[in-house]
Amino acid sequence: MADTGDMEHIFKRFDTNGDGKISLAELTDALRTLGSTSADEVQRMMAEIDTDGDGFIDFDEFISFCNANPGLMKDVAKVF
């Protein structure tokens, strides 16, 4: 699993406008970089990660997702 520093680095790369949260557009751009462009897949991931339903992924939600998906995060860390 990526360590907290790696997760913070990845979060900041996804959060392109630096507002401390990842929007649907930012998630779409990040997943496109990883080779995923399906709008349905992006929507599904957003719904899964955005546990409070505010339309954004905050750092705590991102950490929870990373901890639940360590294999995926290793792959993401290699790209970012």
Curated annotation (Swiss-Prot):
UniProt: Ca(2+) 2 binding residues:
50, 52, 54, 61
Q: Which CDD domains match?
A: EFh
Keywords of this entry: Allergen, Calcium, Metal-binding, Repeat
Q: Where's the EF-hand domain?
A: 2-37, 40-72
Which residues are involved in binding Ca(2+) 1?
15, 17, 19, 21, 26
Q: Which domain of life is it from?
A: Eukaryota
- The portions of this protein that span the membrane are none
Which InterPro entries does the UniProt entry name for this protein? EF-hand-dom_pair (IPR011992), EF_Hand_1_Ca_BS (IPR018247), EF_hand_dom (IPR002048), EF_hand_pair_protein_CML-like (IPR039647)
Q: Does the keyword Metal-binding apply?
A: yes
**GO molecular function annotations of the record:** calcium ion binding
Q: Which PANTHER family match?
A: EF-HAND CALCIUM-BINDING DOMAIN CONTAINING PROTEIN (PTHR10891)
Name by which UniProt lists this protein: Polcalcin Cyn d 7
Q: What is the lineage of its organism?
A: Eukaryota, Viridiplantae, Streptophyta, Embryophyta, Tracheophyta
